[in-house]
């Protein structure tokens, strides 16, 4: 059963080939057996899952239908889950049990999904390798000596290893798309405001967006259907009707205009990945797409702008973790200042502390205009570049990452080397655009992804193109050895 996609599970539950309880039991046993090799889960919620599975079976027996009813899910451990630890991958929240469910968690539970657990992640979603977690690094199922990408590395590794068919992730600078590329999955970052951020522990509030990780575009469409929608509790949620994401998966690509930004194919890109990107372009041309070269002239400024804006927002968001109300508190503080200093110094890991300090510096009185304001101006230029490009093309295509997955620890001593792995994904967050990564082949036995970007609220078009591509290629069907 573990080989089934989310869509196949939906069909199997509908025609009573198996029950949700049987499926849940089988997947929980698989997690117990295989996850020690991967470390993809922080918490496994066995009792909760079996209870939800029985409830889903009862709802189905009473005549209820629904693609997600009784299907399994695991949540990245920054979505609040009522009564279940929500750690954000940090010592700071090791003992935090949220008193409520995040909107995404509540919506999927209402649809009847069964929560198998909470997945490992970079601490406070800060990282591209899932090595900064307080609970240890996650291993890539394609090669256990390599990273799975981050920050949604646990969500990606669990799906790639067939521990379950789909998971939730979040994407602030590529944290859904980059691990999807490095583990042979399909991952979608929706338009900013499409999926509620309420109950999602914030890293950078103007960039964070939740989305699905699965093996196929068809599965991402099903999961996004359950996640998307307006939420009055999130002031940045956008009241835009939610289309049926599965309805147009098979639509023709005849005449679809795809732009290849020349800036994506310069220095830093592994030439073997460039070849795989060109091969995927040829497949889309066979399906009727028209491809042309475009330019995104300000792209080279994206990483510096992002690493001012995101840490600045993080330094503000993470100020609430002070050892007073909830979360980690140091032992026997001498006074209030000592409580703050030691609780934060002991509770946050090195990468989180680094970003808080960078952000605090960028927001300080003498540097605010030179750094933060300048970064926001660059952000506007990057958005304008996309708006201009989309006047002449329907979608933008390029590599998801410049390199395949690297070895565990290889970039730990040089944070900037890891930051550069997000060079192609960051721009979509700065502009708020939807982006999707899909499997496009292998380099040295490690998966490679191709990224598609679309205008606002065009998630359906991204899923359509990825689905048509997956009908004529088989990269997405390949599984890692031993899983």
Curated annotation (Swiss-Prot):
Keywords from the UniProt entry: ATP-binding, Ligase, Nucleotide-binding, Protein biosynthesis
SUPFAM superfamilies in the record: Amidase signature (AS) enzymes
E.C. code: 6.3.5.7
PROSITE patterns per UniProt: AMIDASES
Matches recorded under Gene3D superfamilies: Amidase signature (AS) domain
Reactions it catalyzes: L-glutamyl-tRNA(Gln) + L-glutamine + ATP + H2O = L-glutaminyl-tRNA(Gln) + L-glutamate + ADP + phosphate + H(+)
One of the GO biological process terms: translation
Entry keyword Nucleotide-binding: yes
Active-site residues, Swiss-Prot/TrEMBL: 76 (charge relay system), 151 (charge relay system), 175 (acyl-ester intermediate)
GO terms assigned for molecular function: ATP binding; glutaminyl-tRNA synthase (glutamine-hydrolyzing) activity
InterPro entries per UniProt: Amidase (IPR000120), Amidase_CS (IPR020556), Amidase_dom (IPR023631), AS_sf (IPR036928), GatA (IPR004412)
Highest taxon, organism lineage: Bacteria
GO CC terms of this entry: glutamyl-tRNA(Gln) amidotransferase complex
Keyword GTP-binding in annotation: no
Pfam families named in the record: Amidase (PF01425)
Function per UniProt: Allows the formation of correctly charged Gln-tRNA(Gln) through the transamidation of misacylated Glu-tRNA(Gln) in organisms which lack glutaminyl-tRNA synthetase. The reaction takes place in the presence of glutamine and ATP through an activated gamma-phospho-Glu-tRNA(Gln).
Subunit structure, as described in the record: Heterotrimer of A, B and C subunits.
Family note: Belongs to the amidase family. GatA subfamily.
Annotated protein name in UniProt: Glutamyl-tRNA(Gln) amidotransferase subunit A
GN (gene name): gatA
